[in-house]
């Protein structure tokens, strides 16, 4: 039978104890989505689904007001600022807006304003498009920009001043007359749709992460640690509000006059903003801008209505997390029905197999949609990331009629299946167990939803990332052959697998590397010398360089020490791979691998899967044919004062490098860890040791100076 999602309890029938449980569930879920949206710039659900969660939370809190507490999302704004940027306290909180989803809710908002102000007539209202971007506060002192901050949790944001100075729409100096001594001016950072598409194309071509929508790209670009990255992104800014103002630049200030002043001061103000004098005017603007929505060069997700007179705004004040004098009239999520013709599998650069729905073209929100992501096998089967049913547990099949929604108005997703129209012969989709690009086995590890290609060394879809890993510092570490060179050589077809690196010199009569821009005879000669120097390599570096899933530097060293030599390692791996079956592996070789301290089932299975793929073996054999010697692993001693001890190095070491210290400790039988815990035996502290030293003292861990460490290990 098909699993059914347990329906949310009806609010009308909720008892107080059940309401308390439901509120806790909703609060935790909303807080998680707030973090994904405000901190990670990666929302996990559509705006419509998020709004539905909030409306349910608000409805329950209205029924049980005694259950409202200060930590509820209805009493807070956004999410706490991330740790990567300095914190900034907003002089005036940056609150969020209440939402309206229907015309009568807008009318109710205006009536509430009239009642509160005791007005006979509808006050003038400013209507403006609600830009789907990232809120920003700009502080000016004597007309000069001194600080820029994100909204954060509404009270404390992140200092992004250096990045904001690269946005052309943000003036460093305010123009015109009547400039306040101090003012906080606010607006939205966004990205034009065409700029977003161009950026994603560049990201994809460079093998970098692509953004889900313009809002995410704007937020991610603004919150870059490298200001040059932000400067390279086409960010825009609309000004529409303010916080602290030492003085207003005009008598009897109003919202629309302040927007005019912002325009004169050097900001870009949205030209669509309109002054309305009735509810009918406001709703007419909403419908008009909704019709223009698809043709606008930027994304909007609704309309914001604000009482025009600032003295009225001041009298109206605020309720918990939002002002009484403004409301957001949200657009409904745009959906359409179409037929899913085919499910294709794409292979990512890390080997992940991702299903994509090929749809009969359909217009959703003014955009023609032909593809939609299906995420993974579980999503197709109707199972969410938490293991619970989604879409009422209904699976997705080729030939299905489906409802498509543009999440965040950009990413198409399938939200439901029209079961009444499912073809009689539609079969459940069977996820492929082979990579569609290279034909290698695909595996799905326990606890994961993703299938991955095991053709690590030979799959074209993974080639560039695997080659970058192969030449990385902890692997072959070839001087002069970094990521950019790998990308160039792979793009030209010169290096497709690791062995090709070692044949560059022999092929250079045809390749002519010295004719490349930035190269010359000397640099090419140095590159070939560096490559030749790596024809002799340590066993643990070779194992790490293969890019086997879950085999990092530490596990590579464990494997190298256990088997000792390349021949012993390869012999054991081939024996284990030959014995691999769908039911498992009971061979002596596999059991020996699985029993290595620190390895375990997950790593052992990943290693065997790698060696079970014959084309990986061929690529490895081709590489080994180019190498001169693979050095046996240096066996750790067991007769030293630190054998079996866990050691952490922290601070600036003066007598040896961190890598030298680590290698020496491991040779003496110690385990070197990256963090301090109760299991740590020694912390070796150099100059400017920080939090690790503090934690060691708190836990009572023995702390040694460099000299004391050298004395302990016998210098």
Curated annotation (Swiss-Prot):
PROSITE patterns: BRCT, DNA_LIGASE_N1, DNA_LIGASE_N2. DNA ligase that catalyzes the formation of phosphodiester linkages between 5'-phosphoryl and 3'-hydroxyl groups in double-stranded DNA using NAD as a coenzyme and as the energy source for the reaction. It is essential for DNA replication and repair of damaged DNA. It is an enzyme of class 6 (ligase). The active site is at residue 130. CDD domains: BRCT_DNA_ligase_like (cd17748), LIGANc (cd00114). The lineage of its organism: Bacteria, Pseudomonadati, Pseudomonadota, Alphaproteobacteria, Hyphomicrobiales. Its EC number is 6.5.1.2. Keywords: DNA damage, DNA repair, DNA replication, Ligase, Magnesium, Manganese, Metal-binding, NAD, Zinc. InterPro entries: BRCT_dom, BRCT_dom_sf, DisA/LigA_HHH, DNA_ligase, DNA_ligase_AS, DNA_ligase_CS, DNAligase_adenylation, DNAligase_N. NAD(+) binds at residues 47-51, 96-97, 128, 151, 188, 306, 330. Belongs to the NAD-dependent DNA ligase family. LigA subfamily. It comes from Rhodopseudomonas palustris (strain TIE-1). HAMAP family: DNA_ligase_A. GO terms for cellular component: cytosol. Its cofactor is Mg(2+); Mn(2+). It catalyses: NAD(+) + (deoxyribonucleotide)n-3'-hydroxyl + 5'-phospho-(deoxyribonucleotide)m = (deoxyribonucleotide)n+m + AMP + beta-nicotinamide D-nucleotide. GO terms for molecular function: DNA ligase (NAD+) activity; metal ion binding. GO terms for biological process: DNA repair; DNA replication. Zn(2+) binds at residues 435, 438, 453, 459. Residues 637-715 form the BRCT domain. Pfam families: BRCT, DNA_ligase_aden, DNA_ligase_OB, DNA_ligase_ZBD, HHH_2. This is DNA ligase.
């Amino acid at each position: 039978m098909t699993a059914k999602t347990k329906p949310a309890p009806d609010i009308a029938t909720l008892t107080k104890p059940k309401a308390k449980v439901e509120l806790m569930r909703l609060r935790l879920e909303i807080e998680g989505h707030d973090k994904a949206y405000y901190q990670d710039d990666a929302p996990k659900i559509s705006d419509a689904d998020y709004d539905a969660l909030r409306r349910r939370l608000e409805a329950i809190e209205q029924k049980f007001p005694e259950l409202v507490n200060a930590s509820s999302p209805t009493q807070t704004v956004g999410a706490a600022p991330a740790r990567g940027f300095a914190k900034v306290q907003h002089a005036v909180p940056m609150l969020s807006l209440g939402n309206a989803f229907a015309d009568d809710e807008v009318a109710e908002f205006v009536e509430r304003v009239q009642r509160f102000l005791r007005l006979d007539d509808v006050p003038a209202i400013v209507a403006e498009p609600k830009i789907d971007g990232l809120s920003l506060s700009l502080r000016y002192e004597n007309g000069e920009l001194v600080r820029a901050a994100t909204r954060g949790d509404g009270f404390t944001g992140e200092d992004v001043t250096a990045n904001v100075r690269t946005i052309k729409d943000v003036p460093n100096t305010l123009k015109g007359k009547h400039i306040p001594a101090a003012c906080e001016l606010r607006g939205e950072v966004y990205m034009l749709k065409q700029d977003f598409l161009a950026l994603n194309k560049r990201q994809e071509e460079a093998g970098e992460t692509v953004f889900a929508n313009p809002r995410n790209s704007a937020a991610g670009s603004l919150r870059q640690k490298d200001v040059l990255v932000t400067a390279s992104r086409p960010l825009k800014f609309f000004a529409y509000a303010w916080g602290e103002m030492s003085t207003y630049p005009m008598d009897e200030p109003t919202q629309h006059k302040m927007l005019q002043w912002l325009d004169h001061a050097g900001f870009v103000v949205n030209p669509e903003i309109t002054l309305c004098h009735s509810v009918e005017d406001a709703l007419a603007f909403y419908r008009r801008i909704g019709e223009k929505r698809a043709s606008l060069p930027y994304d909007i997700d609704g309309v914001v209505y604000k009482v025009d007179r600032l003295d009225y705004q001041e009298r109206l004040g605020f309720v918990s997390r939002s002002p009484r004098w403004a409301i957001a009239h949200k657009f409904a999520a745009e959906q359409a029905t179409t037929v899913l013709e085919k499910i294709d599998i794409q292979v990512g650069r890390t080997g992940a197999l991702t299903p994509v729905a090929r749809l009969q073209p359909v217009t959703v929100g003014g955009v023609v949609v032909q593809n939609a992501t299906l995420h993974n096998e579980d999503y197709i089967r109707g199972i969410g990331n938490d293991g619970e049913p989604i879409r009422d547990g209904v699976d997705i099949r080729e030939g299905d009629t489906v409802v498509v929604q543009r999440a965040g108005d950009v990413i198409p997703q399938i939200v439901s299946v029209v079961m009444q129209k499912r073809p009689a012969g539609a079969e459940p989709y069977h996820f492929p167990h082979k990579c569609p690009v290279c034909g290698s086995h695909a595996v799905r590890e326990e606890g994961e939803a993703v299938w991955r290609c095991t053709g690590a060394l030979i799959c074209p879809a993974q080639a560039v990332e695997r080659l970058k890993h192969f030449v990385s510092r902890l692997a072959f570490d070839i001087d002069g052959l970094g990521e950019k060179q790998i990308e160039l050589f792979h793009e030209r077809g010169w290096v497709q697998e690791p062995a090709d690196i070692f044949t560059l010199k022999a092929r250079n009569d045809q390749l002519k590397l010295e004719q490349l821009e930035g190269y010359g005879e000397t640099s090419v000669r140095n590159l070939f010398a560096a490559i030749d120097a790596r024809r002799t390599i340590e066993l643990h570096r070779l194992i790490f360089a293969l890019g086997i899933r879950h085999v990092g530097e530490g596990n590579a060293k464990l494997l190298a020490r256990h088997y000792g030599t390349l021949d012993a390692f390869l012999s054991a791996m081939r024996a284990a791979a030959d014995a691999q079956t769908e039911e498992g592996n009971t061979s002596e070789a596999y059991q020996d691998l699985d029993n290595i301290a620190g390895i375990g089932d997950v790593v052992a299975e990943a290693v065997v899967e790698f060696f079970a793929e014959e084309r990986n073996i061929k690529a490895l054999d081709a590489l080994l044919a180019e190498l001169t010697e693979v050095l046996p692993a240096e066996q750790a001693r067991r007769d030293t004062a630190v054998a079996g001890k866990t050691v952490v190095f922290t601070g600036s070491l003066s007598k040896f490098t961190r890598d030298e210290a680590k290698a020496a400790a491991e040779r003496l039988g110690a385990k070197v860890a990256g963090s301090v815990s109760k299991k740590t035996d020694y912390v070796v502290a150099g100059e400017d040791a920080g939090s690790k030293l503090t934690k060691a003292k708190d836990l009572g861990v023995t702390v040694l100076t460099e000299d004391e460490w050298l004395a302990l290990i016998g210098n």
